[in-house]
Amino acid sequence: MKIKLYNNYNNIERIFYKNLRKENLDNKLEKSVIHSRYMDSSQSIIVPENETLTIAKFPPNRFSEKIGTHPDFIDESLLPKTQYICSIFLDIKGSTRLALKYDLETVQKIKNAVLSTGIEIIRYFGGHIHRLQGDAIFAFTGHSKLLKSDAIIQAINAASVIQYMNQNILKKYFENVLGVSSLKIRIGIDFGDDDEVLWSKYGIDNINEVTVTSLHADLSSKLQNKASENSIMVGENVFSYLQLPDDLLSDIYIKGSSEEKDYYIMKHNSFNYKMKNFDWSKYLER
């Protein structure tokens, strides 16, 4: 990573420090000399409780304050309704190693600090957190007053900065402080247009939620599953709608093969839907 890249995003580390301190991890890990030194060295970085995320070259564009129902559909009388959305599915691998070394309460605090920082980044770029699923985040970008292209860009920005955070901030903390392997974050992004996304209510009485019925929302999870460690996979609608430069996209290979490429996330009769690996590092350095 270039130094200029770190300088652009160093506020992310400050926010991560803040989230760690919120969890009072000093007390839980006080026997760790390395952790004590790490926290002592960060004392010079005074992070006020009210400090919010600020990312150079990316202005804040916060849209949603709550998890669950998308703000466009709080009024359930509007449902069912078709409306585009860009879906982000983020999964964190490797946190189980924490449970082999630390007690459950400590593991929960560490994981929450990581997830909280990821949530703040997604919200910073205009994302809406729809659901937390264990070590995974399911989120949306886009709303009725936002251009579709901007929604896709928001998703790409959020996912790229999260991968940057993992490689440059979390990796250092997990390996040098916690003494475990760094996390592996995989992200899938896909876009469904107006005629490809139906918003409606699922469930009964007081046990229900407003969510989407969309192949492309489902594919964001499948794309995440296809992604390699610390990478982002995007669906065909994403890279074709934005006409992303070829140098930011690459094909992946079928598992176990170094020659046969895996072009499609879904191949069924006449529906052949492509996927690409997105080079988030090169994107951020532009």
Task: Spell out what each predicted region is.
Residues M1-G68, E229-R286:
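Intrinsically disordered, glycine/charged-rich C-terminal tails and inter-domain linkers
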Residues R21-F58, T82-V107, A151-S160:
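Short, charge-rich amphipathic segments
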Residues L53, G126-D135, I169-G179, K226-E236, ...:
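Noncatalytic linker/hinge segments flanking ATPase motor cores
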Residues S64-G68, F89-I92, F191-D194:
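Short hydrophobic/aromatic-rich motifs at helix boundaries and adjacent loops
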Residues I67-D72, K171:
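Short gly/ser/thr-rich secondary-structure transition/capping motifs
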Residues D72-D75, D218-S220:
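A generic local structural motif
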Residues F73-Q154:
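Catalytic NTP-binding/metal-coordinating core of nucleotidyl cyclase/transferase enzymes
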Residues S144-Y263:
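Catalytic beta-strand-to-alpha-helix segment of the class III nucleotidyl cyclase homology domain
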